[in-house]
């Protein structure tokens, strides 16, 4: 019982750290792409469309990451760092984990499509709408944030599976131990 409870506490703290990282990632997702904002000319239409798609995706992952941020308060309220979970706690954490798993899977799919779209954007006319750029300016695509997104969402998916699983095992182990003690005391 002590080992599984120790694992529960480790998952508890990992959950908190990963949810904070996930929230920070959702806030910072678009910062590398601020130079793609405000294009209106027909020649830069692909940039405008791509930026709009990125904004829409960013909005979704922000709201989904809020679930994780709120979940931090929930795990403290349920006292999962120093208490064996009851059925209610398991159901609540499992529901939260399902939303977070959806976020991770959605993000994996969307990162792939956005990266593919990013490859096809024509950046050669950016200089027409940006006085800071010369006509021979070459835009360098930035993929780091996508790769970080894969890592962050992989961690979200892993903890979304691990934490409820460990809570369920802890709960069942506690019930089993209680039944064994009841038989011994009878």
Label the model's feature ranges:
Residues 2-7, 74-88, 108-122, 155-186:
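Cytosolic juxtamembrane helix at the C-terminal end of the final transmembrane segment
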Residues 5-12, 34-38, 88-90:
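Membrane-interfacial loop-to-transmembrane alpha-helix junctions, especially the N-terminal start
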Residues 13-28, 92-113:
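Hydrophobic alpha-helical membrane-insertion segments
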Residues 18-24, 67-75, 99-105, 155-165:
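Alpha-helical transmembrane segments
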Residues 32-58, 107-148:
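Interfacial non-cytosolic loop connecting adjacent transmembrane helices
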Residues 46-85:
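Alpha-helical transmembrane segments and their immediate interhelical/interface regions
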Residues 58-67, 145-156:
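Alpha-helical transmembrane segments of polytopic membrane proteins
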């Amino acid at each position: 019982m002590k080992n599984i409870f120790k694992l529960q506490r480790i998952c508890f703290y990992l959950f908190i750290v990963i949810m904070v990282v996930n929230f920070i990632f959702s806030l910072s997702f678009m910062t590398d792409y601020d130079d793609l904002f405000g294009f209106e000319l027909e020649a830069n239409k692909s940039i405008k469309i791509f930026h709009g798609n990125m904004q829409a995706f960013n909005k979704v992952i922000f709201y989904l990451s809020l679930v994780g941020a709120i979940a931090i308060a929930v795990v403290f309220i349920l006292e999962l760092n120093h208490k064996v979970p009851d059925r209610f706690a398991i159901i609540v954490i499992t529901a939260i984990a399902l939303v977070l798993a959806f976020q991770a899977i959605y993000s994996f799919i969307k990162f792939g499509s956005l990266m593919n779209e990013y490859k096809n954007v024509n950046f050669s006319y950016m200089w027409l709408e940006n006085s800071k750029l010369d006509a021979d300016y070459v835009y360098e695509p930035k993929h780091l944030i996508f790769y970080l997104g894969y890592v962050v969402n992989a961690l979200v998916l892993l903890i979304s599976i691990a934490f409820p699983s460990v809570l369920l095992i802890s709960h069942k182990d506690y019930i089993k131990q209680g039944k064994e003690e009841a038989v011994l005391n009878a």
